[in-house]
Amino acid sequence: NKWIRGAIPALLLHCSIGTVYCWSIFSQEIADYIGFSKGAVEWAFSFAIFFLGMSAAFFGGLVEKNIHKSSLIASITFALGMAGTGFFIWYGGNNPHSVLSLVGIYISYGFIMGIGLGTGYLSPVKTLMLWFKDKKGLATGLAVAGFGAAKAIASPIMSRMLTGLGEGGIFKMFYILACVYFVMMFIGHLILAKPEGWVEPQTKSKNEGIIATLKTEPIASYIGIWLMFYINITCGLAIISQEKMIVKCVGLGAAAGIISTISALFNAGGRLGFSAWADKLKDRNTIYKLIFTLSIVSTLIVLLTKGIANVAGNTVLIVFVLALIFIVNAGYGGGFSNVPTLLSDHYGMGNISAIHGITLSAWAFAGLTGNQMASFIVKHTGSFIDVHGVQANPVGYQNVLIVTTILYAVAMCLSCFLVRPMSKK
């Protein structure tokens, strides 16, 4: 049954690992508990995204060969990384300002959990496309939507746990979640299976197979896919990382939590909606052109109206800013869900897990550059002023939009001129 063997295990895996995006819920609590600045602790999240992409790139061949081994590795490393993070938070609470505690969190949350993220993200994708051959976009969108929706589902639960578990709630929460997510992922691992009768194409070696597959098209086309994927993630992370402060700038600080949940739903909806829509199109690259067009138009409107810098609380400007946030979140999610199916249309299903894994290295580098780029711009341009009772830099946030608009335009050019249309294989 394609739902039991494909869709449900994919959701169990992705709804677990997708909670990595709940980082902002507890990052300040970790920093306060172990006695370090929030900036120092933030690197754990950047490392997690980096190793997500790199582990997907390096373990793509393993996923291609044995999804049961890769999904088991994902279950163990993700849960172990969570439990290890809890341990080093506990250690830091007993030994404030301990470098060992900080480095332990980097290794546990960043490296070990990052391996679980990459292998867990990749493991069910090809299997879903094999089960849903006529609706590959809908199938992968459903699973990847689970990754995006995980934040909306888990954030209120984590917030309640932090307050309800009393003293030391931050490290207790990680212990509990490690157990819960291991059970979910292990069940997903047990029931995940490719369709009966599917035989992997034989190649002389893993690398030879990937290289030969990529050579079936001009390499410029693959470079274009990689770069536009990278740019979409970089711009998405840059804007999403400043989302909370942008919302406060337009006078909606009290509703920041609700807006964050709605934006997470747009993220998940974009993953499902754009990929399902792409099933009806001749060329899935059209979806990326649509994503980049919507992103450019929404950022330009906010820039031209100075919607963030104008803090007067104009209702129309507030609508423009909220539309920008929701559109960017939807496009960010849609970019992820369409990559595996776009690659399968160009290169076939033979080495799709390995090629998808290599392409996810773009996520690794975007995880390091997106947030950091936005932070650098906000820190070094404009100035912090009192806005609705909080210190914010409206001009800095506007400048982030200027840079992302330019990058979105570059991505549009890549999509139009470098990524060639292909008939589906």
Feature-to-residue mapping (PLM):
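C-terminal transmembrane helical hairpin of 12-TM major facilitator-type secondary transporters
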Residues: 263-266, 273, 280-342
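Helix-to-loop junctions at the C-terminal end of transmembrane segments
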Residues: 55-67, 271-283
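A late C-terminal transmembrane helix in Major Facilitator Superfamily
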Residues: 151, 346-383
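Hydrophobic core of transmembrane alpha-helices in multi-pass small-molecule transporters
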Residues: 81, 96-119, 230, 316-334
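Intracellular juxtamembrane helix-capping segments at the cytosolic ends
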Residues: 30, 119-132, 139-140, 334-347
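Extracytoplasmic gate region of multi-pass secondary transporters
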Residues: 23-28, 155, 220-275, 336, ...
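C-terminal ends and interior cores of transmembrane alpha-helices
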Residues: 77-97, 294-313
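Helix-loop-helix hairpin linking two adjacent transmembrane segments in secondary transporters
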Residues: 147-196
